[in-house]
Amino acid sequence: MMKILAMDTSNKALSLAILENKELLGQVTFNIKKNHSITLMPAIDFLMNSLDMKPTDLDRIAVAQGPGSYTGLRIAVATAKTLAHTLKIELVGVSSLLALVPEQVEGLVIPIMDARRNNVYAGFYQSGQAVRSEAHLPLAEVLEIAGAADQPVTFVGETAAFAEQIKAAIPQAAIQPTLPDAAAVGRLGLDLPAQSIHDFVPSYLKRVEAEENWLKNHKESSDSYIQRL
């Protein structure tokens, strides 16, 4: 039996879960505007203590690897890597978008996260399988893709800010807001192969703003940017 600590801080909500294989033992989710760096470790301690568990009881850590908030992803990934290294246990990363997809929703399911300026991080799933690559896209492009689908379409995830635009473009589309769910991260991460702790990095899908601004003012390649840093 594998005990998994799963975490998702890719968005405004912070979600933690502990599972034994796919059975949920306990979960906490905080949907408050608070820096995840302040709340993550105390929340892990609270959950572990509530289940009378010790860190050494864990076999694997599953973390929402991205996309999402740059700061949130860095906090979760750094914490997951530190715990996995210290405890000498396995580490796996799970798509933050896939973890937003509810079970048993028919047709094309499109999880979205607000990426600002009317852009979104979007995935395209059918029966839990990706039918297009996850990407950072203008909402208009996502709506164009969804509008061309010959099957029911459901938008999930961070939908509130975009509900009016979705309904205007695709009146028949279903909209189902979903919060980050660490239990889903844990279940998705159960069967994945363990990843290298040293090489594990967030999946941003988009350059950070500082890098984009630098590249606008320089003709060199993105490799040059990294070298200069």
Predicted feature locations:
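N-terminal beta-alpha supersecondary unit
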Residues: 1-65
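Short beta-strand scaffold segments in enzyme catalytic cores
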Residues: 14-19, 120-124, 203
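A glycine- and small-aliphatic-rich helix-loop capping segment at beta-alpha/alpha-beta transitions
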Residues: 20-24, 78-85, 127
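Surface "functional belts" at beta-alpha junctions
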Residues: 23, 35, 90-180, 209, ...
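Residues at secondary-structure transition points
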Residues: 31-42, 70-74, 78, 176-180, ...
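DPxDG-like acidic metal-binding loop motif
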Residues: 60-91
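Acyltransferase
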Residues: 174-229
